[in-house]
């Protein structure tokens, strides 16, 4: 196929478009054939918008700004009709604008997961792809939970990795942000500062080093941690800072209780004072994770109620509140007036089975459709929590919602499947995702898996595998989906033949015990392939068991 790009000076966008096409077909460049014209016109409409116009061999992608042009390129690529040798673009129905202003994804750089271990060049390419699917910001955290002090090697490793990610995003025109756990201390926090742990009842995420800001000297100690974190990015520039209440965080002493509606907003006020000294233009976000999830009969403990009062009075500077939970969407923000723009925090990484991503891809499309439908009327975007590449499909699902809240997952993921795999297998892959989800949810909730669903998912995956072109067949997005369908069947078969009905059998199934597949050579090969994709190679199992596939002995061979 002969292609010519008229960049009009938009070289970053042109380079990414060319590279994306080269990855799919063999094109001859700057020759007579299809012409792709790139342009920016801010008069067309809202920021970050685009329009695709043209027919036959001349197409024009116009953005209202640099990001809008990237999104237009993404849509042209994702919606085009591709063959092995060429593609036919599809025009948009007028100007396309995002419904939600805040569209971030959170790269969790810890636990020796993919973001932690992947080389920078992989993260560059992935961030480009995340951008093309419609995101406009990347968040990271400098994980105090892992640190003894700010002089150890781990601190510099985390700092350098987060800085590299931020530079990637900024170079593309995206915004960047960080999260500060408002009262979390280092692992060496003096015992005299420790928080009252009573607020952790029925909550996870307490490493034992959270701090009570009301203890003499504790606020100064916390302030020194916040400033140290914030100082690491002054040359790059932070566009957002979010404070976090629980997991990690919290204090149950009388002066702080209820933490979410009392101690946390007051501590966040102090964080904000330090933020604006270094980043006067940064937007400030308050998270409400785990709010009111511990009940004192006959009513919740009043964390949302207390926070909303602060937002109406001494916290007028807050730009967004983040509202979400591990399970269904919290009710309070749905039933009360919106006092600040609300964003969500979809739990796409840790719902259900362990290790996270240890069997491969983790599609949960029906679950996320239900949660989105229950909350979309109050949302101005969100930030999926990501531990790696294995939940890529869910990032794309939420990106689709943030652009068009009324879209259904089948439409969003249908376009994803057609582009990433083939337009000939859309229905089959959607069914694979739904079958994987069915058993994922059954097992997560303590039920027996549906054996017929597991067999059907594997059969479909094997059939799809024979229909894909070499590029799609070997691409990591298909490999992790294919491996998930295969490994699920193997795990459920072992459970069915050896464990069903025994004590703790369903708990062991939920955790994917290593011994389930220890003697299955085919499974071991597939699991080791996952480890290579995730870069969990030659690591001690105990260091990264959260995201380490359940390979025999916790070791991975470097060569196939």
Predicted regions and their residues:
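Contiguous, structured surface segment used for ligand recognition
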Residues: 1-100
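Acidic/histidine-rich, surface-exposed loop or edge segments in extracytoplasmic proteins
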Residues: 1-8, 107-111, 144
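Short, hydrophobic/amphipathic alpha-helical patches that form generic packing surfaces
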Residues: 16-20, 67-81, 395-402, 438, ...
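Catalytic-core regions of glycoside hydrolase
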Residues: 81-85, 110, 136, 143, ...
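Boundary/entry segment of secreted carbohydrate-active catalytic domains
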Residues: 98-114, 122, 141
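Catalytic domains of carbohydrate-active enzymes, especially glycoside hydrolases
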Residues: 120-144
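Charged, amphipathic alpha-helical linkers/stalks
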Residues: 391, 403-463
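Histidine-centered catalytic/metal-binding microenvironments
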Residues: 445-560
